[in-house]
Design a protein with these regions (language model features):
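Internal gly/pro-rich beta-alpha loop/helix module
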Residues: 81-189
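Cysteine-nucleophile active-site neighborhood
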Residues: 249-323
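Phosphate-binding active sites in nucleotide-utilizing proteins
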Residues: 195-200, 204-268
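Structural motif
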Residues: 41-43, 71, 75-76, 103, 105-108, 198, 200-204, 376-380, ...
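ATP-dependent carboxylate-amine ligase catalytic core
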Residues: 1-66, 74-98, 110-114
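Short, surface-exposed amphipathic charged segments that create phosphate/polyanion-binding patches used
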Residues: 30-31, 137-152, 238-243, 320-322
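C-terminal and late-domain segments of enzyme folds
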Residues: 6, 170, 190-193, 207-216, ...
Length: 396
């Protein structure tokens, strides 16, 4: 859900995750982008202390690793002074986490706002503002995140900026959260090679790409984006690596199947050197099944002997961190999908055992077919790299 950030700032957001990357790598990523910035915002995920193992991997841990203050955003809907007990708990739970101030969300009236500000006065913590309920900013959700398809993003961004400026004390917020960036942290220098790398990307079916991955790939050559829904976007013969990231192919199955020239070119080249993650892997199946009664399916690339079902009857949430060792490289990532593999050829087996965040085995498959690597897992290779995964490095 980083599309708001990119729309408002004009630059992509980067991933900071203590499960998927080392503390040193997180510092390098943060410093490399913070050293020339005026303002840096690290958005927390879930609750402040929610991690993959108690508070490990939580927003609180990231704040400690990067030495950043925390602005606590509190949902004040249908609540008032009872929130004081909760906020007090956040303030005292971990003395190493600095809570710089509080923003209340969904305040209902002037009197409600007055009551909320009294909480901060009594707890001696700055109140940075109270955001009122505002239906125009309410976003619909869908099974894998926020749904931006029905909104005018330009209008939303402008409206949001006006509301924040009116209801938050932005100058004070920037003042009390100001910190020096540790520019002594060494940032690895990029290398420069001349590979030819093609990446599937559009607004829907191939829309989930870590910005770090694009930075990484750009070190190894020229990155060209293509839209698999565009039948003229045929993958050329001289491509060294084909990257099919995640997205919502189930929402665009008809459009994907209606581009047979692209399908044929992807099938011809993906085996030479390719990575397919989640939606990208679904695209490589023989069919994407949308309904079983009546049977409705769309032809996909057919590089992997299996089908993928996005039928309501088959949909089950698979979510969580994943890790595995492959060819001497420890890879980590995240899995989040509802579709599932069906009619899998018995010869198509996982190349490795995959584990969850606590080290317990899960049935997520990592397919190794010729020089293709495919899985439901969105891998993070901003730190580990990917070239050692291939039996033959693409392009060599």
């Amino acid at each position: 859900d980083t599309k708001y950030h990119e729309k408002a700032c004009g630059i992509p957001s980067y991933n900071l995750d203590p499960f998927m990357a080392s503390e040193q790598h997180m510092r390098e990523v943060y410093v490399s982008h913070a050293k020339d910035a005026d303002v840096c915002i690290v958005e927390g995920m879930m609750g402040m202390f929610d991690g993959y193992d108690r508070s490990k991997g939580s927003s609180a841990e990231i704040a400690k690793i990067l030495n950043l203050p925390v602005v606590l955003v509190v949902n004040a809907k249908s609540a008032a002074y009872s929130l004081a007990a909760m906020i007090k708990g956040y303030l005292d739970f971990d003395p190493q986490v600095e809570v710089a101030g509080v923003i209340f969300n969904q305040a209902g009236s002037d009197r409600h706002e007055e009551m909320l500000r009294e909480i901060c006065d009594d707890l001696n913590v700055p109140c940075l503002g109270c955001l009122r309920k505002f239906d125009a900013l309410k976003e619909e959700s869908r099974h894998l995140g926020l749904d931006f398809s029905r909104k005018d993003e330009d209008g939303i961004t402008e409206t949001l900026l006006k509301q924040l400026d009116a209801q938050l004390n932005l100058d004070f917020l920037l003042q009390i959260t100001r910190r020096e960036v540790d520019v002594t942290t060494e940032v690895k220098k990029n290398v420069s090679l001349s590979g030819n790398i093609w990446v599937a990307r559009n607004k829907e079916s191939f829309s989930f790409i870590y910005a770090e991955h694009l930075d990484y790939l750009n070190q190894f050559g020229t990155v060209t984006f293509f839209d698999p829904e565009d039948n003229s976007a045929v993958v050329p013969d001289n491509v060294d690596l084909l990257y099919l990231p995640g997205g919502y192919p189930e929402n665009r199955a008809l459009q994907l199947s209606a581009a047979p020239r692209v399908i044929d070119s992807v099938k011809d080249h993906i085996e030479r050197g390719g990575i397919a993650e989640c939606g990208g892997m679904m695209y490589l199946a023989s069919e994407l099944v949308m309904c079983k009664d009546p049977y409705t399916a769309f032809k996909m690339v057919d590089a992997l002997p299996m089908k993928v079902s996005a039928c309501k009857d088959d949909m089950r949430l698979a979510m969580g961190y994943r890790s595995f060792d492959f060819r001497g490289v420890k890879l980590r990532g995240h899995e989040f999908h509802y579709s599932r593999i069906i009619d899998q050829d018995e010869k198509l087996a996982s190349a490795v055992q995959v584990y969850n965040a606590k080290g317990h085995p899960v049935n997520t498959a990592v397919f190794r077919y010729k020089n293709l690597i495919a899985s439901y897992t969105h891998l993070y290779w901003g730190e580990t790299g990917i070239w050692s995964l291939f039996e033959q490095v693409p392009g060599e």
